[in-house]
């Protein structure tokens, strides 16, 4: 449509791949991340700001101090690490007051990637050990709140306002959740089965193995480690694996 937009990715590799794919599809696109030279970053940024390129694909290194009021969409190709980052980046859409769109994609590996960044963050290397521990716990909690945002069925604007301490009980009517009718489903049986399975494993196995057990998998890992003797083995065999993954999240 010719609209200007920003696509945020977690890693340089994702930026390169998304930019490559869009360019092959004929889109006017450029990129921005810390792995590029200062000269290329500056050139790409100016090409986007002055309309020579329609789409900017970037890591969170892009955006500070950028004044481009006609950004019509902001897409998060990956979930950011906290609500603060998301709010700031999504807020770059529609600064001219015209209708704009923000889209957030999520998959479980985004949580793992962000957790890895938090665990191995070099920006806190100058802090003492006790302070680093406090900062890491804070960042992990913020990551949890960001993940909750991806799964909530409440008004997304309301969630953001409440997160930042501005209590709101009204619905915006614009977000996907406000425009979607949700059906409540009782998953007590599934949840309790998964919890009992984890207890029997002393919580020593990951999600994929737990799902394999309760679904009745016969992989070499399951049979070789006698995990088919778990009391919850195959209890949820009639559920689909994607559904069990969704519940376990």
Language-model segments: residues:
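Helicase motor core with emphasis on the C-terminal RecA-like subdomain
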Residues: 1-130, 141, 166-170, 177
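Short glycine-enriched loops at secondary-structure junctions
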Residues: 13, 108, 160, 216-217
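Short Gly/charged-rich anion-binding patches and loops
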Residues: 17, 43, 145, 209, ...
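Short helix-to-turn junction characteristic of helix-turn-helix DNA-binding domains
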Residues: 48, 150, 198-202
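Accessory DNA-binding and partner-docking regions appended to nucleic-acid-acting proteins
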Residues: 113, 124-128, 138-139, 156-158, ...
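C-terminal accessory regions
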Residues: 139-167
């Amino acid at each position: 449509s010719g609209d200007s937009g920003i696509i945020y990715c977690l890693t340089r590799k994702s930026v390169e791949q998304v930019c490559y794919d869009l360019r092959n599809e004929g889109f006017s696109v450029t990129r921005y991340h810390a792995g590029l030279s200062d000269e290329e970053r500056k050139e790409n940024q100016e090409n986007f700001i002055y309309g020579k390129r329609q789409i900017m694909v970037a890591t969170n290194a892009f955006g500070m101090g950028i004044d481009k009021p006609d950004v019509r969409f902001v897409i998060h190709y990956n979930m950011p690490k906290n609500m603060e980052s998301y709010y700031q980046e999504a807020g770059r859409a529609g600064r001219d007051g015209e209708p704009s769109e923000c889209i957030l994609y999520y998959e479980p590996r985004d949580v793992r990637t962000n957790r890895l960044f938090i665990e191995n963050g070099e920006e806190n290397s100058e802090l003492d050990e006790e302070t680093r521990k406090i900062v890491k716990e804070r960042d992990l909690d913020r990551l949890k709140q960001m993940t909750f945002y991806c799964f909530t069925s409440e008004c997304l604007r309301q969630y953001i306002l409440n997160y930042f301490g501005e209590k709101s009980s009204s619905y915006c009517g614009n977000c996907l959740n406000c425009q979607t009718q949700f059906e409540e489903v009782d998953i007590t049986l599934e949840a309790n089965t998964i919890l009992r399975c984890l207890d029997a494993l002393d919580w020593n196995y990951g999600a994929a193995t737990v799902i394999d057990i309760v679904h009745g998998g016969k992989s070499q890992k399951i049979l070789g480690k006698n995990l088919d003797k778990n009391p919850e083995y195959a209890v949820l065999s009639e559920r689909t694996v994607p559904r069990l993954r969704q519940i376990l999240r």
